[in-house]
Amino acid sequence: MSRRNAAVKRPVLPDPQFNSRLASMMISRLMKHGKKSTAQRILSDAFSLISERTGGDAVELFETAVKNATPLVEVRARRVGGATYQVPMEVRQERGTAMALRWLVTFSRARNGKSMSQKLAGELMDAANETGSSVKKREDTHKMAEANKAFAHYRY
């Protein structure tokens, strides 16, 4: 790790097709082996499927899904005197959004379905309706933090 200054955080430019920063971040999470155009096609196909099924704006539904999957607290391991405690900590907004996007992609890939765009569309619609694996993961994370509330004084 560099002893010099911390790396400058580069701003995320909005996606030109959807004019959304979140869409741009999602494309980066979907991308495998540098194939950005494939990731963009998957997201645009998923958005068109969402528009067909719901009749509403897919980008708004996507933003709702990300908001519903974003955790507010998480547990982090902390060693104190030979014992490791799961210490609940608040999640910064950028980290929470990144975790939500990561979970949405992970659980979309794990779904049963024909194409990745169909699986992603299904997971996004479920997350927007506060169901689905990514929202369940957020609830589990919150439950873990609640269960380990006694160790909150070990925060760092």
UniProtKB/Swiss-Prot annotation:
SUPFAM superfamilies: Ribosomal protein S7 (SSF47973). This is Small ribosomal subunit protein uS7. PROSITE patterns: RIBOSOMAL_S7 (PS00052). GO terms for cellular component: small ribosomal subunit. CDD domains: uS7_Bacteria. Part of the 30S ribosomal subunit. Contacts proteins S9 and S11. One of its GO terms (biological process) is translation. It comes from Prochlorococcus marinus (strain MIT 9312). It comes from the Bacteria. One of the primary rRNA binding proteins, it binds directly to 16S rRNA where it nucleates assembly of the head domain of the 30S subunit. Is located at the subunit interface close to the decoding center, probably blocks exit of the E-site tRNA. Belongs to the universal ribosomal protein uS7 family. InterPro entries: Ribosomal_uS7, Ribosomal_uS7_bac/org-type, Ribosomal_uS7_CS, Ribosomal_uS7_dom, Ribosomal_uS7_dom_sf. The gene is rpsG. GO terms for molecular function: rRNA binding; structural constituent of ribosome; tRNA binding.
